[in-house]
Amino acid sequence: MDTSTISRNFGYIKSKPDKRDVLITFDKKTIKTFKLTANIKPKIIDGIFDLRKIVTLPQALSEIDQGTLGSCTANAIAYAYAFAEIKQHNRNTFMPSRLFIYYNERMLENSIDEDSGAQIRTGIKTINKYGVCDEHHWVYDPLKFRVKPPIEAYEEAKVAKSVKYARIDFTKDTTIDDRIEHIKRALLSGFPIVFGFVVFESFMSQDVTKTGIVNMPKSYEQEIGGHAVCAVGFNENDKTFIVKNSWGSKWGLNGYFNMPYKYVADENLASDFWIIQEVTDPIINNFDPNDINPDAINLDVNINSGGVVHN
C-alpha cells in the first residue's frame, strides 16, 4: 500500500446524547411504508443496491469538494438535502449552499471565528430552522467561511427547509449484524444516510484515493480525525456500503467509495446516523445550474493547500 497522504481537514464532531432527538427505526414493515415520488421502486440488482439509480443526480453533486475547510458535515448534509429534493419533486431545483450551512452550524455552536467543524445534529437543525440558500447565491469560497451570508441568502433560504428529519435508533440492535441490516433497511426505504466515522491513516493513502476501496483499519493504525459522509447504497458481494465523500470527483470512484459493513456498523467507529425525510418545494428565482462555477464545487486537493489564512 502507498501510504503517502494528502493534506485534508475533516470536521466531524461526534454528538452527545440528546433526548430531544427525533428517532426512527426501520424494520421490514417500514420498507413497504415509504414510497418514492420518483415512481421507481428501489431494487437490489446482482447484489447491489444504489440509490443513485432511482433519481437523476447532477454531476455537480459528485464534484463537491470541501477543500481545506472542516466542513464535511455541511457537505454531506447538502448532498442528502439535494437528493431528497430531487427524489420528491423529480427535478433539480437548486444546489444547496454548503458554506451557508457551515456558517449556521458554527453560529449555533458558538464557533463562528474558527474552522471548528460541527456536529451532524447541528447541521440538520440549521436547515430546519434557517433553511438553505442556493450555492450560486452563496458560493463555496473557503476564504469566506467567517463571513455571514447576506440577508438575501437568508430570505431565499426560508423557502428551502427540511421539514422532517430523524436520527436512526439502533437501541434494539444487539449485534453488528443487526446494525448492518438496519442500515440497509434505511437505504432500501429510499434515504441516503449522513453519518460520521473515525478516520485512520490508511484512509488517506493514495491507494484509497485512486480506488475508492476502504479496508478495516489495522490495529497499529493511528486515529487521525472524524469525518462526515453520506451512504447511498450497499454491495452484498463485497460486503460494503457505497458512500459519498466530499473531496471532489477525482477522489475515489467519482467522489464515492466503498466502506466495509463492519466499519460502518461498529458503534466505536461510526455514529450519528441521520436522514432527511422531507423537504419543502423551493422555487428559486433565476436558477440556472450553469451559473455555478465548477471551480467553486470541485476545489481539488491543491486549491488552498497551504491552509486558509485570515487577517
Curated annotation (Swiss-Prot):
One of its GO terms (biological process) is proteolysis. GO terms for molecular function: cysteine-type peptidase activity. SMART domains: Pept_C1. PANTHER family: CYSTEINE PROTEASE FAMILY C1-RELATED. Belongs to the peptidase C1 family. This is Uncharacterized peptidase C1-like protein L477. It comes from Acanthamoeba polyphaga mimivirus.
